[in-house]
């Protein structure tokens, strides 16, 4: 697989929820996960699963559609449109926010850096936190 296909596989495994089983195969054991809006950093495939689970628990039908990929060296930046309904619970540092059924549609950017073995060594996600929280009805 080329790097854009590997980047697409990350989105595909999120969408079909197989990321829980495949994260260790797709990611380096020391992968760095960065949520830019919150400055949260985590390490390892298990942290990626926990991070992804947070969004799935809040928006169980959340799916991401890759709009565009740009490759530069061993990095792929993907522009993604996420859509779903806030029917679960979003856990934040300020406490839990219960779902209200609101539709959510947000564009976000994911930058993935790959090693020579095709494993993700760095996964950075960036999105408009204010818009996201507004759509949830939490802002």
Annotate the PLM regions.
Residues 1-139:
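C-terminal and inter-domain tail/linker signature
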